[in-house]
Amino acid sequence: MYVHLALILGCWTVILQGAETDVGERADKRRPIWNLGHMVNAVKQIPTFLNDGANAIEADITFKGAVPTYSYHGTPCDFGRDCIRWEYFDVFLQTLRDYTTPGNSKYYEKFILFVLDLKTGSLNNNEVRKAGENIAKGLLKNYWNNGNNGGRAYVVLSLPDIAHYEFIRRFKEVLKAEGHENLLDKVGYDLSGPYLPSLPSLDSVHEAFRKAGVDGHVWLSDGLTNWAPLGDMARLKEIVERRDSENGFISKVYYWSVDKYSTTRTALDVGVDGIMTNFPYVIIDVLNENGYKDKYRLATYDDNPWETFKK
């Protein structure tokens, strides 16, 4: 009897300890940070950025007409980078799938999100819609494996012009028509431009998302190339303030290109959720510093990239 009672008490102790651990993890109030490797356009660069501490990457997708053809940036680009690294779009997506599919020999558990910087600036309205269709079909086939054990990472589609909201509408229509509407749970959107002659107001950005049929899953970016003066981050602060407002429509805010320790600290102090960098280890180092490690942490797959974390 006493042995039986001891076993019962022992089991309850283990259960309670486990519960305390779960509560502790759920009670972590630190802001999760997405550490985005910048301009990762060649497949050989993917493990390099991941090993340097990135939990997400950004790639530039160029088009021939409405057809996504390469992951490629071109010149000019950030100081110190090779601007002409590239891969065929389909191959790039297939490789991303390898790195984000549990059980694959290349799988990286910490690789949880990628941003496709879609170079649609030269496309007309009809081409923009067709491009949205082609991106949807490309992701469905080459990344999500037609819904059969595809990659698990979240995807952010970043467009350079708020006038290109039809891209998003068509993208969503295609996934629904193909019977994979559920995959939209994995997709977010960024409409952040055009930059010239001046950036659109946040009200105009919000209206573009309404036209796109997007309510939630909004990532909004701001930034400068790494060879430009930092400035006062006024636009970034405005975006963060809008994210945190009662009528905020923004889920996450990210800033680019951040390569310095001082700029990383400033961006975190402003309240960003993500930092795009050429040197992911810099962000990791700052996240481990006194004054930051108690406020911020690297995001994991369990963190919802569409959930707003206010200051």
Curated annotation (Swiss-Prot):
Cofactor(s) needed: Mg(2+)
Location of the protein in the cell: Secreted
Tissue: Expressed by the venom gland.
Gene Ontology biological process: killing of cells of another organism; lipid catabolic process
Residues annotated as binding Mg(2+): E58, D60, D117
Keywords, ordered alphabetically: Cytolysis, Dermonecrotic toxin, Disulfide bond, Hemolysis, Lipid degradation, Lipid metabolism, Lyase, Magnesium, Metal-binding, Secreted, Signal, Toxin, Zymogen
SS bonds (residue pairs): C77-C83
EC identifiers of the protein: 4.6.1.-
Prosequence residues removed at maturation: 22-26
Cofactor note: Binds 1 Mg(2+) ion per subunit.
Entry annotation: catalytic residues: H38, H73 (nucleophile)
Catalysed reactions listed for this entry: an N-(acyl)-sphingosylphosphocholine = an N-(acyl)-sphingosyl-1,3-cyclic phosphate + choline; an N-(acyl)-sphingosylphosphoethanolamine = an N-(acyl)-sphingosyl-1,3-cyclic phosphate + ethanolamine; a 1-acyl-sn-glycero-3-phosphocholine = a 1-acyl-sn-glycero-2,3-cyclic phosphate + choline; a 1-acyl-sn-glycero-3-phosphoethanolamine = a 1-acyl-sn-glycero-2,3-cyclic phosphate + ethanolamine
Keyword Nucleotidyltransferase in record: no
Family recorded in the similarity comment: Belongs to the arthropod phospholipase D family. Class I subfamily.
Function: Dermonecrotic toxins cleave the phosphodiester linkage between the phosphate and headgroup of certain phospholipids (sphingolipid and lysolipid substrates), forming an alcohol (often choline) and a cyclic phosphate. This toxin acts on sphingomyelin (SM). It may also act on ceramide phosphoethanolamine (CPE), lysophosphatidylcholine (LPC) and lysophosphatidylethanolamine (LPE), but not on lysophosphatidylserine (LPS), and lysophosphatidylglycerol (LPG). It acts by transphosphatidylation, releasing exclusively cyclic phosphate products as second products.
Listed name of the protein: Dermonecrotic toxin LlSicTox-alphaIII3i
